[in-house]
Swiss-Prot record:
Name assigned to this protein: 7-cyano-7-deazaguanine synthase
The entry's keywords: ATP-binding, Ligase, Metal-binding, Nucleotide-binding, Queuosine biosynthesis, Zinc
Binding sites annotated in the UniProt record for Zn(2+): C191, C201, C204, C207
The encoding gene: queC
Cofactor section: Zn(2+)
Pfam families referenced in this protein's UniProt entry, alphabetically: QueC
Binding site for ATP: L8, S9, G10, G11, L12, D13, S14, A15, T16, V17, L18
Signal sequence segment: none
Manner of cofactor binding, per the entry note: Binds 1 zinc ion per subunit.
Keyword Lyase included in the entry's annotation: no
GO biological process: queuosine biosynthetic process
Pathway stated in the Swiss-Prot or TrEMBL entry: Purine metabolism; 7-cyano-7-deazaguanine biosynthesis
Amino acid sequence: MKPAIVLLSGGLDSATVLAIAKAEGFAPAALTFRYGQRHAVEIRAAERVAAALGIRDHRIADIDLRVFGGSALTSDIAVPKGELDEAIPAGIPVTYVPARNTIMLSFALAFAEVLGAADIFVGVNAVDYSGYPDCRPDYIKAFEAMANLATKAAVEGTRLTIHTPLIDLTKGQIIRRGLDLGVDYSITSTCYDPTPDGKACGHCDSCRLRLKGFAEAGLADPAEYAS
């Protein structure tokens, strides 16, 4: 099996992508980041997901993005909340972490070179998402082009591919795909502002998108919510 790198946050999307990479015949190594996020319970979720899917190589990289701040996920800025039936506001929300996907994909690129992998999987989505600019197809294409100019492996003839299997799927479709592949969503963590014991808030954009996805799929969300 070919090696691949999968960015694994511990959330619903990345767990699904990890299962997809396995189903497509890759031998995935998972890469998770401890970047100073307020929702650090996702690190434990990533460990659970990696174990459940039989991933032998799971690395956790420490990068402290709190030194820059500028996001509700890495500073004292309040996480926006709303009700399930409210539309998520247009524009880029304060939960956007400046350059996060670029930073993480760069780490994944370095990891791929070390492992001799030519494939990186990431769970970005441009349908049911919060409007982050680094989740768009054009961004992924641009990063892939850069990667194939910037690495020793590419210069020597090994073309790198960034896989985005969820990019055009609704959240409900993602959930259905994951369930078909045996993903246990009860062990994932999606919330941006969980309680200290790991319960989801149920009102941040991420929780609302997740809940709407399960409703679309006609299923109950197995996550534990504080309210």
